[in-house]
Amino acid sequence: MSEHQSLPAPEASTEVRVAIVGVGNCASSLVQGVEYYYNADDTSTVPGLMHVRFGPYHVRDVKFVAAFDVDAKKVGFDLSDAIFASENNTIKIADVAPTNVIVQRGPTLDGIGKYYADTIELSDAEPVDVVQALKEAKVDVLVSYLPVGSEEADKFYAQCAIDAGVAFVNALPVFIASDPVWAKKFTDARVPIVGDDIKSQVGATITHRVLAKLFEDRGVQLDRTMQLNVGGNMDFLNMLERERLESKKISKTQAVTSNLKREFKTKDVHIGPSDHVGWLDDRKWAYVRLEGRAFGDVPLNLEYKLEVWDSPNSAGVIIDAVRAAKIAKDRGIGGPVIPASAYLMKSPPEQLPDDIARAQLEEFIIG
């Protein structure tokens, strides 16, 4: 387990001040979701939330105080408008009043692939000093929602979080929390990180992972498996550029296979995005097949299709990741937050069985 470095805890505020990098569909669902659940009863089980109140923080305690993007239709606009602008096409679940948070121009770096570049217009505004912007907004947690393949850009924002003393939630498959060098940077700086690569509430990865483990636990030899995903959002369009996919395929594959005892040949496990289908909008369809052998080596195959709205499915997990990062910051913890990362992320520094990871997260919440 990665070491946590603890300091005397600073005085905790009653809110979680969040900055967002990448005002796309996932950001849209998160911002709308905070509004949607603003008056949720924290004494009841509420559909769509694992925790109405996560430690001391209710969903409504999440406040958006800064945002960064490169899209000309988002930069310079209020966050409440930007989340519905340009190519954003997720389902609308709530009206969002003006936030008085103006989306700022971040550096582009490698954040825009060729399909993005053909689709959106880049803002001609000068990139801001991100570290200074984080400090001025008194940000507690920075959430990175950059496009898949944004290796340089994601690490740039991770360093900005360290320099500004801001907790970091790494929602994309760039290996930062799970990279010992970066984990040490966060630990040494006494800055918490939750990562890498967000799991959905009930998505292709978590269902595939659970069913593969079920095969193993029930004595069925899993011989081969595949997972194909199609969707109509900018994430899937971006992933048509296969050069940007390496870390995504690794992350999704190890999220499934790391839960199993046996090793698989590369050809026997195929997990990854398949294609972009524009009319699906922000919906994702996953096709999953598991082939195994049961009693007497008799074939046993399982095939299913999962249909989800991709971004709300992610937001239901990010809302907990953000609050976990804030609790770690309140407690003076630096480095990877293992319980939150193991339960909420595909590629945490330490892979744990889901039941153990969940139990550890509940213990972490209690403190």
Curated annotation (Swiss-Prot):
Post-translational modification as stated in the protein's UniProt record: Pupylated at Lys-73 by the prokaryotic ubiquitin-like protein Pup, which leads to its degradation by the proteasome.
BP GO annotations: inositol biosynthetic process; phospholipid biosynthetic process
PTM sites of type N-acetylserine: 2
Classification via InterPro entries: MIPS (IPR052199), Myo-inos-1-P_Synthase (IPR002587), Myo-inos-1-P_Synthase_actino (IPR017815), Myo-inos-1-P_Synthase_GAPDH (IPR013021), NAD(P)-bd_dom_sf (IPR036291)
Cofactor(s) needed: NAD(+)
Keyword Ubl conjugation: yes
GO cellular component, as recorded: cytosol
Reaction equations catalysed: D-glucose 6-phosphate = 1D-myo-inositol 3-phosphate
Coiled coil: none
Residues the record lists as binding NAD(+): 78, 137, 157, 200, 235, 248
Presence of the UniProt keyword Lyase in the record: no
Gene3D superfamilies reported in the protein's UniProt record: Dihydrodipicolinate Reductase, domain 2, NAD(P)-binding Rossmann-like Domain
EC nos: 5.5.1.4
GO function terms (MF aspect): inositol-3-phosphate synthase activity; zinc ion binding
Sites of the Isoglutamyl lysine isopeptide (Lys-Gln) (interchain with Q-Cter in protein Pup) crosslink: 73
Top EC class, one word: isomerase
UniProt KW keywords: Acetylation, Inositol biosynthesis, Isomerase, Isopeptide bond, NAD, Ubl conjugation
Similarity remark: Belongs to the myo-inositol 1-phosphate synthase family.
Note: Was identified as a natural substrate of the M.tuberculosis proteasome.
Alphabetical list of PANTHER family matching this protein: INOSITOL-3-PHOSPHATE SYNTHASE
Function summary: Key enzyme in myo-inositol biosynthesis pathway that catalyzes the conversion of glucose 6-phosphate to 1D-myo-inositol 3-phosphate in a NAD-dependent manner.
The protein's name in its UniProt record: Inositol-3-phosphate synthase
